[in-house]
């Protein structure tokens, strides 16, 4: 199935609505490449197939074959979506969506790997529940959680019960980010190993590395996922491991006394604790001894794999960990067979992150071939056959087929959630959302779950937590405490406005959505979050934000759309609506009613429900009437008559001639798409709640961008109008702050490679004051190894001496490497010889023996390392530049598409959005990336043909450049300003001198930016060098009037029209032929330009030069003929005098509209010959000047340089007077 070609920059608008399609045609619509161009532009909708999500998704029929759900974060194939149907009226949706995208209205942040939900569960959610699962179980009868000791199962969950379980991933989840295949680089690192496994399994992919979070617990996360598919048992595994080591410490010490010192066991046991915080100088991270312990805890083998090169090395990077301390008969499942091994692996050469390898549900169980089965670790090799059932070919089956059912897992999670709510007063899913929106999105990493839980609980109790009904993001109403204290922003504002603050008054700050009271004792303002309300979402800026309760439920207002799906009704949005504590399929209809009793007249509005799928929710006319009468006339005698009248009135109002008439009350925020926005068009059966545009340049746009009420439009318009002023102020402020602060490159910003999970075994920063001794394992490249104890103050040279004593290797032959990946330990710099080495307890260093090398070797190695570092910096910069380019492509493509939908060209639409030409705007960014920003620098954009722009540094923006009138700020009325300025220039052209003619002053547009006036340029300028030069008009006649030459020099810098509009034609192919060596830059899909206009193909320069020669030769020939015709009537002396007079008169102010050809402009990737024309009289004068000059050069070989006027020192060929080569 071939992918469709990428969309052009300016696609045509969507087609008119079509008739509803059949199910078969809709299925075909979801397949790219199977439809005509007309149908490929349709927008389809479908539901997420996850039963816990089922969000409505909208996507173009010609887009990507996979769709990412913006609710749960999973990515699904189009054919997997449920209920695929065509959206017949996407115009308004696309308009609002693209407009919001261009205005920078972002949706909720994309879910990271911890927050992607599968079956309603995210990784972070499971981590929060894991401590509870270590102490609680689920009663099979009631499905409720109970303490394990109350169920007579001990204090701690026995992980051996999971010894025969194995996780098999569903095929549809293999590519789900954060749940399926690992994306930290392991697929490349383990490629050869996985290929060998694939060949051993009949070339079928049946064992894949899957994701686990790198938060310091990756080993137990990997084991937990290999067992049950979730990170639910990491806490129990750590506690089981610690208890196991404590109970069997004597056996472990006896077994590993040759490998592990007795003093190390205390650290090994402490590292198993879930809350372990390492002391200074002690590494954090579970090691091989812990994997061996886990194998004994689970009563099953654990196989650790590595890349093929790592498995073949002498290091113990791969091994088979057998439950050697457990009798083999206890390592069996319920069927009596040995528990099959589970498999984990290193994810990279750094060997600092474990990942599990699991099988695929529905495929054959994976088999590990004999050549990949590592040696047993810590026990005799013959025990492998005792604990692992080997196949006939020597391999073994991984995992098994006894998986924990999803239904049971979800029931278990639901039971544990109740315990979490009882313990903390807040739902774990709400804590997970707080972590996502308030910590991860702001760059705060490593915060303990207990701290996040406490912060979330306090925010709920203070009524500061709000949820957006449009994008689902959490927002916090938070004000810095320092703003409320004396000297703070809000405190000073209240005092300057109200004078002396009083404790019996409330002070409102509308811009901060805050109401405060005053505490005279502490002299501070106290925020009252009960009276304060957040008015807009911090992420999508939508106005439908509501408070959140501790259980995760939302405090809805009447009319709000809830998350409950609606199966019927006339509303059309697909969701139920909240009204007076209940959820309805439809919004109510509203009509006025008048009550008259006892001389009183009361007007009231009745809200009527009539089309509910649950009949009990439909309004009862007698109940409604009784409530109205009781509300306004309580206890009135004889009010039953009034009730009867009200009943008749309501029945009359609700009795419709057409049962399909449905006019619900209009409430902002009730639907993703407003009824008023449709403008009388027929509503589709299910209005979009979100839409996803995908394709070659994937951009996800969220449902909140489809929802714009009148209030939102007003706010957005105000933002747009004030954007330029605010950007200017912010820019000036940043400039002031950045003055005197040189830009530095932080080494921490340079990464070794892409990784979706941080390294797990982190080490505490080294401190030379550490009092503990450090035990370092040293290995040499010839196979020797030893454990060396170093003091905390050991220096580099003392380390070298220790190595020399231990291995008899002279210091000058030692190349010491440490860390993962190994890096060379360099000698200290001068003056720092007494500094301790940066080695920590438990580190392993390798010694490379330098054969036949002098002591100068380390300097060479340092130079090599420096070179590699520079290469890494270059690669990092390249990646960053690529990301910026892709962002500019997306914005430019959206702009072109939106302009087409609005029926305008790009310039007509873009000039109405001036912020695009200011800092942060798409055109500003393109110029900044492509050419760089310099005051007065000009540029053009392929999407805005015929327009030239100039950068104004004082205002920090791009302005429209009109040669004859000057520079103008971009705005909706810029064309009117240009016309007015041009007409004014034309009116003044006859009354003022040419020296004051409106132009760029002394500067003109050139290929590299700015070209100086002719009189200021250097002599002998080469064509197309980026400097302007004219065709040359200074006569070589020494008797010419000097005033005439001076006037010519002044006139030459003025701007004129292009030669392409005159009788002299230029061929476009000559100027668009780009050099193969030129650096092409893509600034939008399908559009390329050149980074520097000066890098032009010499062939193009030669072609342009020849055309200039032909042009001048034609003018000269015409003039020679004219002179021959007049030679019979005039004497040679008269002819010379007439030529001088002609040149003098032709350059007087007011006689010419344009000057002489001067500069060549190469911008925007298209080479344009920007020269200037004259009328026929000027052409004749030019010819006369050239002829006179040619003759004068023949007669006088010596000429003053200033009279050459940028021509060559000598003209060697009279037929080519303009040869500038």
From Swiss-Prot:
Residues 1-19 have a biased composition (Pro residues). It is an enzyme of class 3 (hydrolase). Pfam families: OTU, OTU1_UBXL, VCIP135_N. The modification N6-acetyllysine is found at residue 407. It is found in: Nucleus; Cytoplasm; Endoplasmic reticulum; Golgi apparatus, Golgi stack. The modification Phosphothreonine is found at residue 762. One of its GO terms (biological process) is protein ubiquitination. Widely expressed. Residues 207-360 form the OTU domain. Signal peptide: none annotated. Its main location: nucleus. Residues 1-40, 724-778, 988-1009, 1117-1177, 1189-1221 are annotated as: Disordered. Phosphorylated at Ser-1206 by ATM or ATR following induction of covalent DNA-protein cross-links (DPCs). Residues 754-770, 1162-1173 have a biased composition (Low complexity). Residues 1198-1208 have a biased composition (Acidic residues). Its EC number is 3.4.19.12. Keywords: Acetylation, Cytoplasm, DNA damage, DNA repair, Endoplasmic reticulum, Golgi apparatus, Hydrolase, Nucleus, Phosphoprotein, Protease, Thiol protease, Ubl conjugation pathway. The modification Phosphoserine is found at residues 746, 756, 767, 993, 997, 1076, 1197, 1206. One of its GO terms (cellular component) is synapse. The active site is at 215, 218 (nucleophile), 353. GO terms for molecular function: cysteine-type deubiquitinase activity. Deubiquitinating enzyme involved in DNA repair and reassembly of the Golgi apparatus and the endoplasmic reticulum following mitosis. Necessary for VCP-mediated reassembly of Golgi stacks after mitosis. Plays a role in VCP-mediated formation of transitional endoplasmic reticulum (tER). Mediates dissociation of the ternary complex containing STX5A, NSFL1C and VCP. This is Deubiquitinating protein VCPIP1. It comes from Rattus norvegicus. The lineage of its organism: Eukaryota, Metazoa, Chordata, Craniata, Vertebrata.
